[in-house]
Design a protein with these regions (language model features):
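General small-molecule cofactor/ligand-binding pocket signal
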Residues: 12, 105-110
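Short His-Asn-centered micro-motif
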Residues: 48-51, 78-80, 110-111, 120-121, ...
Length: 160
C-alpha cells in the first residue's frame, strides 16, 4: 500500500459522499457505494469484466443500470462462458447470463478471463482483485482511477 501512496493514491476507509474520489484504493467493505454511484452516473457506456457471476450481484446490476440504459447507456458484461464452470454451475450461470441479456445487457463470453475491472464512460476505471459480479472476499481490493488512457488500454485487451 505504501507504493500506491507514493504514486498518488489514497486509501479510503469511508468514502466521501459529496465527491467521488479518483485515484483511490478501496477494500471490500468500502468500494460498493462509490462504485454503484459511478454506475448510476454513467452517460455513455459501462463495461464490466467479471470472470464469475453471482445471482445477487447480477440482480443488483440490472436494477442499478436500468435508468441509464433507458437514456442510451450501453452496458456490456465480459465473463467466462458458462461451459467453463464446473458441471453443477453451468445451468445456473447460463440462467444469469440469460437474465443479463434479457435486461438489455450485452454478454460477451471470454474464455480464460481472469481480470476484474469496470470501465465507465471510457474514463473511470475500477481495477483489482474484486470480482465485481460475484462474491466479495475479505482481502479483495480495488483501485478507482480516472484515466482515459488506462480505460482504453483495458478495453483494447478485451477486444472492445
Amino acid at each position: 500500500m505504501c507504493t500506491y501512496r507514493r504514486i498518488g493514491y489514497e486509501i479510503l476507509a469511508a468514502p466521501n459522499e459529496e465527491k467521488q474520489t479518483v485515484n483511490a484504493i478501496f477494500d471490500s467493505e468500502s468500494y460498493l457505494p462509490v462504485y454503484e454511484k459511478d454506475l448510476m452516473q454513467a452517460r455513455k457506456s459501462i463495461y464490466i469484466a467479471s470472470p464469475g457471476l453471482n445471482k445477487n450481484k447480477v440482480r443488483r446490476l440490472i436494477a442499478l443500470v436500468e435508468e441509464q440504459q433507458s437514456a442510451g447507456v450501453i452496458v456490456t458484461v465480459i465473463t467466462q462462458p458458462a461451459e467453463s464452470y464446473l458441471q453443477t454451475r453451468v445451468e445456473p450461470t447460463k440462467a444469469l447470463q440469460t437474465a443479463l441479456t434479457a435486461a438489455g445487457i450485452f454478454v460477451v463470453p471470454q474464455p480464460d478471463l481472469h481480470t476484474h475491472f469496470a470501465v465507465i464512460d471510457q474514463e473511470i476505471v475500477w481495477y483489482g482483485s474484486t470480482n465485481l459480479l460475484s462474491r466479495d472476499k475479505e482481502d479483495d481490493g480495488l483501485m478507482r482511477i480516472g484515466s482515459r488512457d488506462v480505460a482504453l488500454e483495458l478495453l483494447e485487451e478485451i477486444g472492445r
